[in-house]
Each structure stands twice: as structure tokens, then as C-alpha cells.
Regions:
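Eukaryotic scaffold repeat domains enriched in small/polar residues
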Residues: 1-301
């Protein structure tokens, strides 16, 4: 019998070999993952060759694109209109069709923006239904940017620190919830902060372990990938638990939480770096650093 993870209505089995086959025996460094409206899966792989890998829901490789554009691919977000936003730590945000046509490049590859301005190693970009684009920026500075649909800067906020509205390193992911709050993963401070879309601090969920990514399903349930304790070039990562996944409601009430370090299916040998929930409630977790893989968690109903 397969091991199960989670609890209550949020119980899952895991397919730890999803996506592997003759064409792709193993994944490289899986930096980002997202699904489109048909539940096709888009895996942004940084190594050995930066590229977007596109899969069927069953895990069959359909297409690759972006090989000549990405340098240090990091995050991907796909909107309901079928447009993908990708971030690259080479200081760019790119906008794509889902078949790999490049629509726009914001920022200049290899050149960080001025201090406080876009971009300095951005980590995640996402678009609201109104067309505004929010960018977690990122590894090179402690900022969140609000851009219009043409990529023009409207507002920025954030400084280094531990107080409300301040950020630790790095500012890693963003998502707008059904209440109109911008959720920002403040990885270095072990929390997800909440803001208005104009940058006013509203509150936070502080009971997290180095949160890397946040994603919401169609019901407004919140899924968070937590890296847990470890170390980086900037020093130790202090976290009370993880690596793992936490599922909560919009009030921060934990619905399910699990995770432990290891190589077995459902465990995390390194850092859960990216997460996305599909229309059926299944979700994908990409890992980076010492152990590169993608696991699919299948919801039991």
C-alpha cells in the first residue's frame, strides 16, 4: 500500500517518478513549476540546460522551449488567459505564450536595475485579473514591485529587516488571494506577509519554516512549500521545521502539514522550492540544490 501524506480532506499519495521516461530519465534543477487550464505542467529547469519542459497531466513530455533565452531560470506563473511570466536571476522578467513564443522582456539580461528599482535577481512574477504585475525582487534586493500590463513601474516597497513590511533574504514569491491581499513569502523571516495591492502591510502568517513558494487553488486554499533549516552562501537558514508542505485556509488555520528530510517518496532531500496546484487538487513540488526532482502529490477523495 502506498504511503499517504497530509490529513483529513487533504490527504495525498505521491508519484515520485512522474515525468520521467525514455526522453527524460531524470530532472535537472527544477526551479519552477506551474499548470495551465488544461492541467498541462510547465517545469522550469535551470540545469543542465535552462529550459521550459511541458508535460501532459500524465507526465508525458510534450515540448521544450526557451533554451536560447533563459540564463538562470527561476520562477514561472501561468494566468487564466494562457500567458506565462518567467523570472530569471539574470535580472529579467519574460512574458510568453504557452507554446514558447516570447512576447516581452522586462529588464536587461545581465544588468541589475538601479537600487530599489526593477530588477535585481527577481524570483517570481504574477499578474492580477486587472492586469497589474507583481514581482518578488528577490535575491539582489528586498523589494516588491507593482508594474502595469506593459511592464511600467507603478510602485515599489520593502527594505531589509524583521519588522512589519520589511523583508529577510530573499523576497521569494507572490500571489494575490480572493480577498485581494498580496501574499509575499518572506523566506528569511519564516513568514508570509499580507499587503494591500498598494503595499500597505495588513498582517502575516509567522508559523512557517523558510517558505519558498505560495500557491492557491480554485477554492482559495493556500499551499506553501517550506525549505526548512539549512545553509546558503549568506549563512545558516534558521527554521523550526521542514522541509515540507503546509496547507491552510485564508485565515491561516492549518489544514494539513507534513515533511521530513530524506530520499523516499514524499520526503524532501533538499529544499521544496516551487509548488503548483492543478484543477483536480493534485499538486507538484520541485526541489533544488543537492537533490533535483519533481514529485506529484495526488489528492485522495
Amino acid at each position: 500500500m502506498s504511503a499517504s501524506f497530509g490529513s483529513g480532506s487533504y490527504t495525498y499519495t505521491v508519484d515520485a517518478t512522474w515525468g520521467r521516461g525514455p526522453e527524460l530519465p531524470s530532472f535537472g534543477l527544477v526551479s519552477g513549476v506551474a499548470c495551465d487550464s488544461q492541467d498541462r505542467v510547465y517545469v522550469l529547469q535551470r540545469e543542465p540546460q535552462p529550459a521550459m519542459l511541458v508535460f501532459s497531466p500524465e507526465g508525458r513530455l510534450l515540448q521544450t522551449w526557451g533554451e536560447q533565452v533563459f540564463r538562470m531560470a527561476h520562477g514561472v506563473w501561468i494566468g487564466p488567459d494562457g500567458v506565462a511570466f518567467c523570472t530569471d536571476r539574470a535580472h529579467t522578467v519574460t512574458k510568453w505564450t504557452l507554446d514558447g513564443t516570447l512576447l516581452a522582456t522586462w529588464g536587461k539580461a545581465g544588468e541589475p536595475g538601479p537600487p530599489g528599482q526593477p530588477f535585481n535577481e527577481p524570483a517570481r512574477a504574477m499578474q492580477t485579473p486587472a492586469g497589474d504585475v507583481f514581482v518578488a525582487d528577490g535575491y539582489g534586493q528586498y523589494r516588491v514591485h507593482r508594474l502595469n500590463a506593459d511592464g511600467e513601474l507603478q510602485r515599489s516597497w520593502g527594505v531589509e529587516g524583521t519588522g512589519p513590511g520589511q523583508f529577510g533574504w530573499p523576497v521569494h514569491s507572490v500571489w494575490v488571494d480572493p480577498r485581494g491581499r498580496l501574499l509575499v513569502t518572506d523566506r528569511g523571516n519564516n513568514r508570509v506577509q499580507h499587503f494591500t495591492l498598494d503595499g500597505e502591510y495588513l498582517g502575516e502568517w509567522a508559523n512557517l519554516g523558510s517558505p519558498n513558494d505560495v500557491c492557491l487553488d480554485s477554492e482559495g486554499t493556500v499551499y506553501i512549500a517550506e525549505g526548512g533549516p539549512g545553509s546558503t552562501s549568506r549563512g545558516p537558514i534558521v527554521a523550526s521545521h521542514g522541509p515540507g508542505v503546509t496547507i491552510m485556509d485564508l485565515d491561516g488555520q492549518i489544514l494539513a502539514r507534513w515533511g521530513e528530510r530524506g530520499d523516499a517518496p514524499g520526503q524532501f532531500a533538499a529544499s521544496p522550492h516551487s509548488l503548483w496546484v492543478d484543477s483536480r487538487g493534485d499538486f507538484y513540488v520541485g526541489e533544488v540544490t543537492t537533490h533535483n526532482r519533481l514529485q506529484k502529490f495526488i489528492r485522495q477523495r
